[in-house]
Amino acid sequence: MNTMSHKFVLALDEGTTSARAILFDSDLNIVNIGQYEFPQHYPQPGYVEHDPEEIWEAQMLAVKKAISKIDAKQIVAIGITNQRETTVLWDAKSGKPVYNAIVWQDRRTSPITDWLKANYFKMIKDKTGLVPDPYFSASKIKWILDNVSNVREKAERGEIKFGTIDTYLIWRLTNGKAHVTDYSNASRTMLFNINKLEWDREILELLKIPESILPEVKPSSEIYGYSEALGNLIPISGDAGDQQAALFGQVAFNVGEIKATYGTGSFILMNIGNNPIRSENLLTTIAWGLEKNKAKYALEGSIFITGAAVQWFRDGLRAIDVSDEIEPLASSVEDNGGVYFVPAFVGLGAPYWDPYARGLIIGITRGTTKAHIARAILESMAYQTRDVIEVMQKESSISINSLKVDGGAAKDNLLMQFQADIIGIKVIRPKVMETTSMGVAMLAGLGVGLWNSLEELRSIWKVDKEFIPSMSEEKRRALYSGWKEAVKRAMGWAKVVGGQV
């Protein structure tokens, strides 16, 4: 094939354990993929860090592999998507990080966020759409400023830059010329006012974070700068947090369109349009912004354990040798045999938010086999997804007609059919499952005019399979009511027995 006439978009997908680079053509087909892992560092219990230099090296190796079969001059745009919230501070002159990146999973800043929760919960939720938690960037920045020698002094003098990983990579790719982020990543820092679309001075003053260290916030599709890292000048023109990029990559451009990504845990995002909706049990976040001072918003629910339960079935119970064996095993029985599995290994996330819940298998009889447990594990992913979607519908008053899916478990036909059955809506699986990278490739291509409209992108996007609900309402109600009873029994367990939280 003569590729010289082709135009390509390069998506950099910087995750929690690996850096990936995916090359897309103008029809959004995947041309090549590069992926390199990098280590996580655990200096103390509850601490999770990355070396930013290792991230950069892994990312550039992934790029080299992804573009190995083409001429870099054919790349018309670069897009960046990233693990959200992870925090880097670096020296503005030398570009060297002043401390390791503090990862989103890190819990060291719990005392700071406990104080915020006790005293400023409503103010922070109203302004940022988030709840005070170590998960978000704000307390991580404060920790570095307070605990790393001379950093606060340098920050006060304007000599320190902060960024989430997208910002750090754009800075490196442009040789320090661009210190920017997009609306979606800014909305995960707990410092960004999602109503006014600007850094919030009240929160910055509360945490004593100088505004000078923060990047400029721009739309998710715009030329931020140019990179010479591949030998010629290429515009960097797309930027979005990983879950928001996946929503865009699922062409969920309309209000009420929703996607679920099934990974170790699951993330469910729903497009709620031009106005943020206040939610009791979910996060309100910015989905993306395609113009200055305009944003699309989303409700987000995070489920802590979905795919990780399959890993536990494989490694903890040694019930299967490889993860792919769970679907045929679960398919070997007609139903769950009355068995429910609540995967509350680390508590329950949305919409329960119970850190004291613990894992539970209930309904076991003498006739229960490992196939029934396998089925109950798969079904738990679908039940938890319904839990979140029900709250989304209730709190937004938006009706949901279908669910778009991606991530590892979305390849499982048994699970996807059960997902459609238990919610009672159509489940749609796309042809290209790399929706996070595809989403930011779309944003980058829009930013340079490779594609001209959302309608054009929607017409290119292809469906692999649709799963239509076939379960009776009576059966659906009975199964879901059993799940809710099982969850009740799992909640608060660590408090009752004094187990470790």
UniProtKB/Swiss-Prot annotation:
Enzyme class: transferase
Binding site for sn-glycerol 3-phosphate: 16, 84-85, 135, 242
The UniProt record lists the keyword Electron transport: no
Binding residues for ATP: 16-18, 264, 307, 311, 408
GO molecular function terms attached to this record: ATP binding; glycerol kinase activity
Keyword terms, alphabetized: ATP-binding, Glycerol metabolism, Kinase, Nucleotide-binding, Transferase
Gene3D superfamilies registered for this protein in UniProt: 3.30.420.40
InterPro entries per record: ATPase_NBD, Carb_kinase_FGGY, Carb_kinase_FGGY_CS, FGGY_C, FGGY_N, Glycerol_kin
Catalyzed reactions: glycerol + ATP = sn-glycerol 3-phosphate + ADP + H(+)
One cellular component term from this protein's GO annotations in UniProt: cytosol
Entries under Pfam families matching the protein: FGGY_C, FGGY_N
Pathway in which the depicted protein is active: Polyol metabolism; glycerol degradation via glycerol kinase pathway; sn-glycerol 3-phosphate from glycerol: step 1/1
Residues reported in the UniProt entry to bind ADP: 16, 20, 264, 307, 408
Ligand binding (glycerol): 84-85, 135, 242-243
Disulphide bonds in the chain: none
GO biological process, one term: glycerol-3-phosphate metabolic process
EC number: 2.7.1.30
HAMAP family, alphabetized: Glycerol_kin (MF_00186)
Similarity comment: family membership: Belongs to the FGGY kinase family.
Physiological role: Key enzyme in the regulation of glycerol uptake and metabolism. Catalyzes the phosphorylation of glycerol to yield sn-glycerol 3-phosphate.
Name under which the protein is recorded: Glycerol kinase
